[in-house]
């Protein structure tokens, strides 16, 4: 048997959370990450599992995730400290066979629970499992500074926000041709915001929480991080453009269409019409 601290998924979570903190996206205990695992992923590390795994109930049944394994950041844990004490900052859990609760097999050595946004993560995992036929395994939430800033000055609709980011950096249309979904401002840590986010996840791999942060998804931690990083870089460009007096020229609709054709992606039609 191998030590779970050396596993690819624990090491991956350490790197992702450290990178997110270094980017300035996750102050204090802000942000949360979940990675869906397979039984094959976790089996080599069973010797590190708790002999009496703690059981917790879910706020609502999620039978679609029955028996699924996850590694998740802990509630109240600081991303800057994950690398110092991953066994306290992270948690490996398995959803019950009836989807009504979960058991904690490893992590949270000083007590606590998984992220307070667990419902939002699980609801989005369910949607993305269906949309991508199981390919997407990561849900990532952070407080990306410039995306939050733009939520104060742009119209809060998908077409407008997406178009602004597409124009901010040429690669954006290629990386997220499906655009950015947007939910209204809502109280975090609730089933309601999870419902609204997962509804947007049916059509978008990025979902903005105005005045709060961003949700991203992908098949790997690197892909989800890179998706958010790309959108945030474009948002930073557009914040600077606005501070310099606004656009004098930009990427045209015809050029965006040509870009999509070159890279074999289908741009969100509503954003092309803005």
Swiss-Prot record:
One GO CC annotation: cytosol
Enzymatic class: lyase
InterPro entries named in the record: Aldolase_class_II_sugar_metab, Aldolase_II/adducin_N, Aldolase_II/adducin_N_sf, Rhamnulose-1-P_Aldolase
Pathway: Carbohydrate degradation; L-rhamnose degradation; glycerone phosphate from L-rhamnose: step 3/3
Record's subcellular location: Cytoplasm
Classification via SUPFAM superfamilies: AraD/HMP-PK domain-like (SSF53639)
Keyword list, A-Z: Cytoplasm, Lyase, Metal-binding, Rhamnose metabolism, Zinc
Principal place of residence: cytoplasm
Protein purpose: Catalyzes the reversible cleavage of L-rhamnulose-1-phosphate to dihydroxyacetone phosphate (DHAP) and L-lactaldehyde.
Protein name (record): Rhamnulose-1-phosphate aldolase
Organism annotation: Pectobacterium atrosepticum (strain SCRI 1043 / ATCC BAA-672)
Gene behind the chain: rhaD
């Amino acid at each position: 048997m191998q030590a779970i601290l050396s596993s690819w998924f624990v090491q991956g979570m350490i790197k992702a959370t450290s990178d997110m903190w270094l980017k300035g996206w996750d102050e204090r205990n802000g942000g949360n990450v979940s990675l869906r695992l397979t039984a094959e992923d976790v089996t080599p590390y069973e010797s590190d599992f708790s002999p009496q795994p703690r059981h917790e109930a879910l706020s609502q049944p999620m039978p679609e995730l029955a028996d699924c394994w996850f590694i998740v950041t802990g509630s109240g844990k600081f991303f800057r400290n994950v690398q110092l004490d991953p066994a306290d900052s992270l948690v490996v859990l398995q959803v019950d066979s009836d989807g009504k609760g979960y058991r904690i097999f490893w992590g949270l050595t000083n007590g606590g629970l998984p992220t307070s946004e667990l419902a939002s993560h699980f609801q989005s995992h369910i949607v993305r499992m269906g949309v991508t036929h199981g390919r997407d395994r990561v849900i990532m939430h952070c407080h990306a500074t410039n995306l939050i800033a733009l939520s104060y000055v742009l119209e809060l609709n998908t077409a407008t926000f997406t178009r602004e980011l597409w124009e901010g950096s040429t690669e954006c249309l290629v990386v997220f041709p499906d655009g950015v979904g947007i939910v209204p401002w809502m109280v975090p840590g609730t089933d309601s915001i999870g419902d609204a986010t997962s509804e947007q996840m049916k059509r978008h791999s990025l979902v903005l929480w105005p005045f709060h942060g961003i949700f991203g998804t992908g098949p790997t931690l690197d892909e989800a991080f890179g998706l958010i990083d790309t959108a945030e870089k474009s948002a930073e460009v557009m914040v600077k453009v606005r501070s310099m007096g606004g656009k004098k020229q930009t990427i045209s609709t015809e050029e965006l269409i040509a870009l999509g054709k070159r890279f074999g992606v289908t741009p969100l039609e509503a954003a092309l019409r803005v």
